[in-house]
Structure formats: structure tokens, C-alpha cells
Amino acid sequence: MLNIAALRQQQIPLAAEPRSPVPFHILMKPIGPACNLACRYCYYPQDETPVNKMDDARLEQFIRRYIAAQPAGAREINFVWQGGEPLLAGLSFYKKALALQARYAPDGVTISNSLQTNGTLINDAWCRLFREHGFIIGLSLEGNEALQDYHRPDKRGRSTWSAALRGIDLLHQHQVDFNLLVVVHNEMAAHAAAIYDRLVSLGARYLQFQPLMSEGAALREGYQLSADNWGRFMVGIWRQWRKRCDRGRVFVINIEQAWAQYFTHTSGSCVHSARCGSNLVMEPDGQLYACDHLINAEHRLGRLDEQTLAAAVDASVQLPFGQQKSLRRECQTCSVKMVCQGGCPAHLNAAGNNRLCGGYYRFFSDILAPLRPFSRDLNGLKAWRAAFVGTAAYCVAPYPDDIPL
């Protein structure tokens, strides 16, 4: 009689999982939309999506097949856990996941884990797990206490600022690497410098600013983000980061990724890649989708147990939303196309234009100013580093600070 458990322990595949010819990631939502907060702008509200927790059998199937389907030669495999609030899955869930990763990881391949949380449930036990296994934590936070408590209350409408800061303090105490993620909406546009200063005062070394997605609860609550306000806010962050000479101390992902993309011609973000579709999303029941912000029938790829992952990735990258994102007419002559690439398809309006286009143009135009004299290759990168990195030159370069925000 076939001993399934023994085969798994020996890493003998139950069925051949073909490798994907292209690199891909799957953002895993083990608890679906379940969350202990009631953010007013949530793009993934619980009342629109059934709440389930991934069972152990599907967790094992996902980890085994996700590892097996990576392209030949992959040296690192990253698992990304998100929600809702993924910590609601429980400590034991992630211990099982880590054990399965160790069981199925081939020799010489590094397994890494990233997790996005609101921070309010973090305790010492979680931090010990994160530290021991090298988790990279993303912590979602508003720019200050007043914004946090209004826009990100708990289920009873109560303040969450102190609980989130307690989570940040614990991450510091346990020396867990983390970044702070801020969702930007119109109300924040005039307060970029103050928000930046407050985040840095919390000891954050990595910051990421994400434009509001006009979907889910955000639509019902009337949240908006205009192109003007997106550009105004991000230029404000850029100016404050430069004014404080924080390069090397504070890593603003929006800036650093664009700078790297200018020289390397590749993006670390699907939003600013020439094509997208290789960052899939999986719900607790095994449903796969082509994009975290396009959870609908048009972008549904089927269930995990209905197909190979290579087939799902191939179907995803062939969808028009990812193939055509940087091919719109207005992008072809744009001076910042090399780092924008049309932005996220989820921000397209009814006319097929990116609602944030003008904001991206303003922000990228400003931050690319110090790079323009250098060639877009490794030699240019070396020359730019020699001229700017490790000096105060980028703090005082002739940028348009006299132009009002």
C-alpha cells in the first residue's frame, strides 16, 4: 500500500509539477479578508468576501507545488503572507508553514518570508518567530495618531495607534527588520513633511507609500486620491527626505526603486514593470487570481488543484491588463516612462488612462533630475554613486524647492 506520508517525508513528488519558464510570486492570503481592524478605505472588506482559514492540506499542497514550480536555477523562493490580518491565522499555522518549507526546499535554495500586518497583534512570541526565521515585516500605519484613529479604527471604532506603536517597539526590541507602509489619500496631501518626520521618529528605516485603491470600502466611504495630490504628497516626501539628508539612513522604497530601475532597466515592483501578471494571489480556498487588486471573474485563473502553477502563470501573463500597461499612446513619448511604465492597471479610468498619471509624472521628474546626466547602464550607476552616494551633494543639488507644493 502506498504510504503518502513517507513519500512526502522523502520529498518524492506525488505528481510532477512542471517548472514555470518565468519567475513568479504568489501572494498568499491564509485568512482571506478576516481582520481585527475596520479600516475605512479597505480594498478587501470582509463583507464582500467569505472569511475562511486555509486548512493544513491546502497549505501543504501550496508550499510543495510553489517550490517545485519555480524556474530552473532559482536560488531564492519568497513566500508573501497577507490579509486581512494574516496574524489571525495563528502562530501554529506559520510554524507548520516553516516546517513544510524546510521539508520541500531543495539543497542550495534559500527560503524567505515576508508578512504584511497592521501590527496590533504583535507580541513577543510573534517577534521570536520572525527573528528566528528572518521574516521581513511590512507594517501598515497612518502618518500620525489622528489619521490612524479615524481611518484605521478597530471593529468597535476605537483607537489603534497605541497598539500599532507597541508592535513597532517589540519589532525594535527583537531586532526584526520591518518597513512602514502608508496608504496615501487626499487628506494627507498637504502633510507629507510632518508625516515623514513622524514615521522616522518611530525608528523606521524603510518606508513605502502606496496610493489609495478606489475599490471596496474606499468607494462606499467616498475616499479619493487625485493625480495632483499623489504628486504633491510624493514630492513632499522626496523634499523632506533630501532636506534631512536621510539617504543611507532612511530607505524610501518609492525613490530607491525608481533610481535602481533607471540604471538597470528592471523594476522591483509589478506596478512599474513594463508588463505584469507574474505576481499571483491565492485565497484560502485555493482560488488563484492574476492581481491583488483585480479579484474578479475576468482575472480569475482557477483553483490550485485544477491546474499546474506553470499553466496559471502563463495564463496570467497573457491577460491584456498586464501586456498592455506600458503600451498606451500617452506613455510612448513620456520622459519618465523608463521608471513609470504606465503604473498599475487597477488605476485605469473608464477611458483607459491612469488616474494618477500626472502625479507620477511630477514625482518621477523631480527624483530623476540628479540622474539625468548619467548613462542608463552600470557605468552610469558607478559614476552617479561616485558623485552622490556618501556625500551631501544630493541634499543641496539644484532641485526646484522654490516651486510650491
Curated annotation (Swiss-Prot):
GO terms for molecular function: 4 iron, 4 sulfur cluster binding; metal ion binding; oxidoreductase activity. It catalyses: L-seryl-[sulfatase] + S-adenosyl-L-methionine = 3-oxo-L-alanyl-[sulfatase] + 5'-deoxyadenosine + L-methionine + H(+). SUPFAM superfamilies: Radical SAM enzymes. Its EC number is 1.1.98.7. Residues 18-249 form the Radical SAM core domain. The keyword Cell division does not apply. InterPro entries: 4Fe4S-binding_SPASM_dom, Aldolase_TIM, Anaerob_Ser_sulfatase-maturase, rSAM, SPASM_anSME, Sulphatase_maturase_rSAM. [4Fe-4S] cluster 3 binds at C331, C334, C340, C357. [4Fe-4S] cluster 1 binds at C35, C39, C42. It is found in: Cytoplasm. CDD domains: Radical_SAM (cd01335), SPASM_anSME (cd21120). Its cofactor is [4Fe-4S] cluster. Pathway: Protein modification; sulfatase oxidation. GO terms for cellular component: cytoplasm. The keyword Transcription regulation does not apply. Binds 3 [4Fe-4S] clusters. The first cluster is coordinated with 3 cysteines and an exchangeable S-adenosyl-L-methionine. Keywords: 4Fe-4S, Cytoplasm, Iron, Iron-sulfur, Metal-binding, Oxidoreductase, S-adenosyl-L-methionine. PROSITE patterns: RADICAL_SAM. S-adenosyl-L-methionine binds at Y41, G84, S140, R152. [4Fe-4S] cluster 2 binds at C270, C276, C291, C344. Belongs to the radical SAM superfamily. Anaerobic sulfatase-maturating enzyme family. Monomer. Interacts with AtsA prior to its export to the periplasm. Involved in 'Ser-type' sulfatase maturation under anaerobic conditions. Catalyzes the post-translational modification of serine ('Ser-72' in the arylsulfatase AtsA) into 3-oxoalanine (also known as C(alpha)-formylglycine (FGly)), by a free radical chemical mechanism initiated via the reductive cleavage of S-adenosyl-L-methionine (SAM). This is Serine-type anaerobic sulfatase-maturating enzyme.
